[in-house]
UniProtKB/Swiss-Prot annotation:
Family the UniProt entry places it in: Belongs to the helicase family. AddA subfamily.
Statement: the UniProt record of this protein carries the keyword Nuclease: yes
CDD domains: DEXQc_UvrD
Protein name in UniProt: ATP-dependent helicase/nuclease subunit A
Task performed by this protein: The heterodimer acts as both an ATP-dependent DNA helicase and an ATP-dependent, dual-direction single-stranded exonuclease. Recognizes the chi site generating a DNA molecule suitable for the initiation of homologous recombination. The AddA nuclease domain is required for chi fragment generation; this subunit has the helicase and 3' -> 5' nuclease activities.
Enzyme Commission number(s): 3.1.-.-, 5.6.2.4
Keywords: ATP-binding, DNA damage, DNA repair, DNA-binding, Exonuclease, Helicase, Hydrolase, Isomerase, Nuclease, Nucleotide-binding
Lineage, opening ranks: Bacteria, Bacillati, Bacillota, Clostridia, Peptostreptococcales
The species this protein was found in: Alkaliphilus oremlandii (strain OhILAs)
Cofactors named for this entry: Mg(2+)
UniProt xrefs under NCBIfam families: addA_Gpos
Subunit details: Heterodimer of AddA and AddB/RexB.
């Protein structure tokens, strides 16, 4: 029986209050959540369908449902009474509200559609479909605006459009529309934020913009005062420039006075700022030049802070800032009207097609629940409401939950230190506000319980995390103080390992190198250097041991124990993957980007671009060099050398005009093809045109023959599907399709290709830190720690913020100049702080993934200079100026006892400061890039040695008796004959379906089958119907992916199939072959009912087993002992207490009710499945079934 900690037990047992459970990383929050639910069911006798359990992903909801089902069955097995009540809970589990916010909203809207006049038959629009609708709505809106000729519109275009186009203004409308969807009442919020611009100087002083600016300036001025205090200390040291003290104290007094003036109206601060006057330093001849320079440097930095405020924040007066805002009011008002106009048109288009998007669902539900009768219905229904991952909520979701909660029935669990989804508009301040205001004692109506014990990581990892984050995370930066409440505490004991210290590898970019190496190093990208060093470390790790509690002993580290975490996978993941493959390390990169970078997609888009406009050099050269153009590099050079002016297409035309060689006629043929395709594009629908290009060029077949051909073909099919969806809109033509695709790219609409990986595959994982959240690994390598933060969010013409509203630049149309408004300046500061806080929490997530070992890797330039900077970075101002993760990590480590190597490198004389948290152990390695080059040179020398031996091999010596030790062996190998020629005809591997076909008695047919190289897509075959085999494949796929907890009706099944179509798992045509009535009948048949109630269900499970050839192939001689591999896929099996149940689905037509004939056809196949399952699981298959969809019947074999 599990032993709960005191805090966990309190979270499980507490009743009569709203609970916020602040659950640290690895603290067992999900287990606590499930146990609380079970105890509510058991002790409070509340049915599971009276609970609302909200998660943030469908996967999390499914896992939660499985965990609850497992916990209920465990309780039933105890036979302590109440089994009937628990059985009832299992039957209710299918309709229990364990759901995402969006799924809950769907339920609310479908139940109460009449209250808001929404078609109950709505479907959720595909992202591409809704993107096209947005584009259409925007184009129509702007066309109407140009026709109206309104002056304010043209002023808006001039202020926020591009130099020659209005695309930036269109993008701004879309950006504002998307942003305000995170508000409960978007249009009201936007209207109020526009009215903020019509303010007086008195209102300006009280505005949130000024409050934010004051907060920022307070941090800056405190930073300046800290620098001056350090300078004063240095000035008074022995040998220090003590004559500087007068000026330093004068500076300090003035800045302190300026700091205190922040408590007054901003006009007072502005006046005080302009009164500051820094006096000159006195001459100091006898002082230590190093101390003198250091002192002057610190003072200059403090002065620069004041200068920055004067020149970049208050370079104009408060009155001028107010005037700017007032003059912007008409533009902001018209911008509001554009956003509303776009919203109305977009909504109309969705209504016409009967679709909604996810934002609609939330706002529809809010409108319904604003009606107290509807809200009261849910208050009465749900005895308790649970919100998982509460730190990732936004204000819309918060408003939804608050509208249906009672006074004391809300349970929220999460960890604000792991709130890393601000880019999805998550709002961690919702968690923080409750964290700071909820009481910790029993009896509070709003109560907070902290789960601080970590059961994932060994103590050395936890100590390191605590040490780093105590030095960097605070209320000002990180949005929460990393104090005793936030720290991690070890929750379980670990067996010792050889080196538990946290390892940090600093790769110095500019370490002194030999001149010979310089050229090679310049060619070696920073990413590749890190990748190679990580690869080398991985190889070394394989010789180390960890303790594995599953085997109750030590074992060697395997590839699958290791994960490489990256802040961004773009460029980095692929580079690491390529290096690992070269080094013989099996690896898998889990990246969400790369679709548009895939060579086949990029090339085909370039072909479309060239057909649309041949005078684009890069796309044209790409197509010509590809298999479609089939030009060699030499031919391309000849064309350009002949004419070095103009576009490359001009050079082609000139070559055709002047030359008479074979290349000319090759070019003529190529141009004719392009012209023909350009003509076709004018008259053929874009999807049909892409189909035609696939056929004309044969490119689809070509990529199918490349490594990863099936994936490449799938990528091209996605492009065809995009064109098919585009064709359904009112926007037509090749140019507009290319424009649409490029808009998807620029709006980060890229998507990674689907990849499948089993958790037991022995490979190193490469993934983003975001993807790793919630996961754990024995060894974690965080790489790219020296990569600079991306803070470009503050560079846009108009910034947006949930609290500060709109932050536009001010443009003077007369002077044709622009400057930042006070609103934009405030938002720049606030967004930077929030972005850095998020980066800090991302680092926390990365550092809390390892169970046994954490290895940190990062590249750094001018390490001595950086170390000195780190040694002085001990306040919020310094941490806010960090450029990357290493700046934060280094700031803490330079003060740690194990940081002596860093202190020596930076020429620092101080000892480590003791702060009670130096229990952490660190190994700090400083590496040079030349290590990699030396290894490469060593490899080259070995290869040259082998080549030299081959070069001087003497054939005459070999013939005349030399090399006798090799000659006999070579002759034996060349003259060798295989002793069992019959075995050559036996295949090494067969599928179960091959075996089934007439029990296989044609050995030669088996041995000489050559599979088709590539598979044509349905759209290229011109099919309008599906074969029986294809229908079966679709039905199997649907059965594999259906959520078994949502199959209560045909409508439930149809909705899930619509979801599969929307996400392009199956096509619209494929979905039509699925008979939902048949599927429903299966789930409610006797065997289907047993399957749905099972504790664990496994679907589409592949297997490979070894069999004697004689057992499988008829007609073989008895003395043949050859083995072969039999592979297959088991449709479904599930666990019951006393064994496994195996089900195989069949869509065969049962003629004249002759079920026995169908069963006979599959007896051998099912016996192989049964044998495979028993051998793989080690458990008995107690029952085997064929489910025949034709007669809606399960038949036991």
């Amino acid at each position: 029986m599990r032993q709960w900690t005191k805090e966990q037990q309190a979270a499980i047992d507490a009743r009569g209050s709203n609970l916020l459970v602040a659950a640290a990383a690895g603290s067992g929050k999900t287990a606590v959540l499930v146990e609380r639910i079970i105890q509510i069911i058991l002790k409070d006798r509340i049915d599971i369908d009276r609970l609302l359990i909200v998660t943030f992903t469908n996967a999390a909801a499914g896992e939660m449902r499985e965990r609850i089902a497992g916990a209920i069955m465990t309780e039933m097995e105890k036979k302590t009474g109440g089994e009937e009540h628990l059985r009832r809970q299992l039957s209710l589990l299918n309709r229990a509200s364990i759901t995402t916010v969006h799924s809950f909203c769907i339920d609310v809207v479908r139940r109460h559609f009449h209250m808001i006049d929404v078609d109950p038959g709505f479907r959720i629009g595909d992202v591409t479909e809704t993107s096209i609708m947005k584009l259409e709505a925007l184009e129509e809106l702007f066309e109407d605006e140009y026709e109206k000729g309104n002056e304010e519109f043209f002023n808006l275009v001039e202020a926020f459009g591009g130099t020659r186009e209005d695309r930036p203004l269109q993008d701004l409308v879309l950006k504002i529309y998307g942003f305000i969807q995170s508000q409960p009442y978007p249009e009201i919020w936007l209207r109020e934020r526009v009215e903020d611009f019509a303010l007086s100087i008195e209102a300006f002083n009280q505005s949130p913009w000024i409050r934010t600016i004051k907060k920022r300036m307070g941090i800056l001025l405190k930073g300046a005062m800290d620098l001056l205090e350090i300078a004063q200390t240095i000035a008074l040291e022995p040998g220090g420039p003590d004559v500087y003290e007068e000026a330093i104290l004068s500076d300090l007094d003035q800045i302190k006075e300026l700091y205190h003036s922040l408590e007054n109206p901003i006009t007072d601060f502005y006046e005080q700022l302009n009164c500051i006057n820094f006096i000159r330093l006195k001459t100091s001849k006898d002082s230590d030049p190093i101390l003198k320079e250091e002192c002057k440097d610190l003072r200059d930095k403090a002065k620069d802070i004041v200068k920055d405020i004067r020149e970049n924040i208050f370079n104009v007066s408060p009155e001028e800032y107010v005037e700017d805002l007032n003059r912007l009011y008409p533009l902001m008002d018209y911008l509001y009207r554009l956003v509303i106009g776009f919203t109305e048109r977009y909504t109309e288009k969705k209504t016409d097609k009967g679709i909604v998007d996810f934002n609609d669902l939330e706002h529809f539900a809010l409108r319904i629940l604003a009606n107290d009768l509807a809200a009261q219905e849910y208050r009465e229904k749900f005895e308790y409401i649970f919100v998982d991952e509460y730190q990732d909520s936004n204000i819309v979701q918060e408003t939804l939950i608050q509208s249906i909660k009672r006074e004391d029935n809300l349970f929220m669990v999460g960890d604000v230190k792991q709130s890393i989804y601000r880019f999805r508009l998550a709002d961690p301040t919702l968690f923080i506000e409750k964290y700071e205001t909820f009481g910790t004692e029993e009896g509070h109506i709003n109560r907070r319980i902290d789960l601080a014990k970590n059961f994932r990581s060994r103590g050395q990892v936890l100590n390191g995390v605590n040490y780093i984050f105590k030095h960097m995370m605070s209320k000002e930066l990180g949005e929460i103080d990393y104090d005793e409440r936030a720290a991690l505490y070890q929750g379980t004991e670990f067996e010792p390992i050889q080196d538990p210290s946290i390892e940090i590898n600093l790769i110095e970019k500019n370490m002194e190198i030999d001149e010979e190496m310089e050229e090679e190093l310049q060619e070696l990208a920073d990413i590749e250097v890190e990748a190679r060093i990580v690869a080398k470390r991985i190889k070394a790790l394989l010789n180390e041991e960890i303790y594995d509690p599953r085997v109750e002993g030590y074992r060697k580290i395997e590839y699958k124990d290791i994960v490489v975490l990256l802040r961004t996978t773009q460029n980095w993941a692929q580079s690491f993957l390529e290096v690992f493959v070269r080094e013989g390390i099996p690896a898998y990169a889990d990246a969400n980007t790369g679709y548009f970078e895939a060579i086949e997609v990029n090339m085909f888009l370039n072909l479309l671009r060239v057909i649309d406009n041949k005078r684009q050099d890069i796309p044209l050269l790409s197509v010509m060099r590809s298999p479609i153009g089939d030009f060699t590099t030499e031919e391309l050079i000849h064309i350009r050398v002949n004419d070095k002016t103009g576009t490359y297409y001009d050079a082609i035309e000139k070559y055709v005009e002047e030359k008479t060689d074979d290349l000319k006629y090759k070019l003529v043929s190529f141009i004719e093809k392009l012209n023909q395709w350009a003509n076709d594009a004018r008259y053929i629908k874009i999807d049909q045109f892409i189909w035609k290009l696939f056929m004309d060029t044969g490119y689809y077949y070509y990529v199918g023959a490349m490594p990863g051909g099936l994936q490449r073909q799938a990528n091209l099919r996605v492009l065809f599907d995009r064109a098919n969806q585009f064709e359904k809109t009112s926007i037509k033509g090749l140019f507009n399709f290319i424009k649409f695709i490029e808009k998807l790219q620029s709006s980060k609409g890229d998507m990674g290709a689907a990849k499948i990986l089993g958790e037991n595959d022995n490979v190193v994982r490469i993934m983003s830190i975001h993807k790793s959240k919630g996961l754990e690994f024995p060894v974690v390598i965080t790489a790219g720690m020296g990569k600079n933060f991306n803070l470009r969010d503050t560079s846009a013409d108009v910034l947006l913020h949930k609290d500060l509203g709109l932050g536009p630049k001010f443009t003077d149309p007369n002077l044709r100049t622009y400057r930042d408004t006070i609103a934009k300046l405030a938002m720049k500061d606030q967004i930077k702080i929030e972005s850095l806080s998020e980066e800090m929490r991302i680092l926390y997530v990365a550092f809390t993934r390892p169970k046994d070992k954490l290895i940190v890797v990062g590249s750094i330039r001018n390490i001595e200079k950086q170390v000195k900077k780190w040694s002085k970075a001990d306040n919020v101002y310094s941490l806010m100026n960090a450029k990357n993760y290493l700046d934060w990590i280094g700031t803490a480590l330079v003060k740690h006892p194990d940081g002596q190597a860093l202190r020596e490198l930076g020429g620092l004389g101080f000892d480590a400061a003791s702060d009670g948290m130096e229990d952490s152990e660190w190994t700090i390695n400083i590496l040079g890039r030349q290590v990699i080059v030396l290894e490469e040179q060593d490899k080259v020398l070995k290869e040259e040695d082998y080549r030299e031996k081959l070069l001087y091999f003497n054939r005459e010596d070999f013939s005349s008796g030399g090399y006798t030790e090799y000659k006999e062996e070579i002759e034996n190998r060349l003259n060798w004959k295989y002793d069992h020629p019959h075995s050559v005809q036996i295949p090494s591997k067969l599928s179960v379906s091959d075996i089934k076909k007439a029990h296989i008695n044609e050995i030669d047919v088996i041995a000489h089958q050559i599979p088709i190289l590539v598979k044509s897509p349905k759209f290229m075959e011109g099919k309008t119907t599906f074969t029986a085999a294809e229908r079966g494949t679709v039905i199997h796929f649907v059965l594999q992916h259906l959520d078994l907890n949502k199959v209560g009706s045909e409508e439930d099944i149809r909705e899930q199939i619509h979801w599969m179509v929307a996400r392009e798992l199956i096509t619209e045509e494929e979905s039509k072959v699925v008979d939902t009535k048949k599927i429903l009948n299966y789930f409610y048949s006797p065997i289907g009912e047993r399957m749905r109630k099972a504790k664990k269900v496994y679907r589409e499970s592949p297997f490979i087993i070894e069999k004697s050839a004689g057992e499988v192939i008829e007609g073989l001689s008895d003395d043949i002992e050859d083995k072969l591999l039999v592979q297959g896929i088991i449709d479904c099996y599930f666990e019951e207490k006393d064994g496994l149940i195996l089900i195989d689905y069949k869509n065969d037509i049962v003629l004249n009710g002759n079920i026995a004939a169908v069963v006979a056809r599959y007896e051998l196949q099912l016996s192989l499945y049964r044998e495979a399952l028993e051998r793989i699981t080690g458990r008995e298959v107690k029952e085997t079934y064929l489910y025949l969809f034709d007669v809606d019947q399960g038949v036991r074999l």
